[in-house]
Swiss-Prot record:
Natural source organism: Staphylococcus epidermidis (strain ATCC 35984 / DSM 28319 / BCRC 17069 / CCUG 31568 / BM 3577 / RP62A)
Keyword Transcription carried by entry: yes
Name this polypeptide is given: Transcription factor FapR
GO biological process, any: fatty acid biosynthetic process
Protein's gene: fapR
GO molecular function annotation: DNA binding; DNA-binding transcription factor activity
Family per record: Belongs to the FapR family.
Role this protein plays: Transcriptional factor involved in regulation of membrane lipid biosynthesis by repressing genes involved in fatty acid and phospholipid metabolism.
Keyword Transport applies: no
Keywords noted in UniProt: DNA-binding, Fatty acid biosynthesis, Fatty acid metabolism, Lipid biosynthesis, Lipid metabolism, Repressor, Transcription, Transcription regulation
Superkingdom, natural source: Bacteria
Amino acid sequence: MKLKKNDRRVAIKEAIELNPFITDYELCEKFDVSIQTIRLDRTHLNIPELRKRIKLVAEQNYGRIKSIEANEIIGDLIQVNPDVSAQSLIEITIDSVFAKSEIARGHVLFAQANSLCVALIHKPIVLTHESQVEFKEKVKLNDTVRADARVIDITDKHYIIEVNSYVSDMLVFKGKFKMYYTSEDE
């Protein structure tokens, strides 16, 4: 049963508040209406499109990082809990894929994961010491990749960070990064 317009708009607003990264396509499937209807409803509710919502969340998080400038992060930093965990999103664009196959270049996924590891560590200097990575599935043009990083160990000079990257719920990249750091007093 379809919702009436006002009820649907309330439900759309609640769905976006619950998950600011939900796409218009996911909303149109959820509410069984056209994508144009979702866009009109969002406009009526003064809710920006997904890209703008991601940028707003990312801008709020950039002030919480110490080791890297915001413009050096590959992707948009959507969540950071310094020295614990972080998330970023990247949309795979035409300049990130091979022309013939439209499959994402591996270094894009690696760069997203690696820069997320650097951003996550709340120290002035952070460098990659070593990494072990696996590319699990193909990532294609227009896919949105969510990278989740979490610290699994800390030693005198290194953080060990695990990164899993997903397209929707499908694991596409897995990595373990050993990151070297220096403290303020060094």
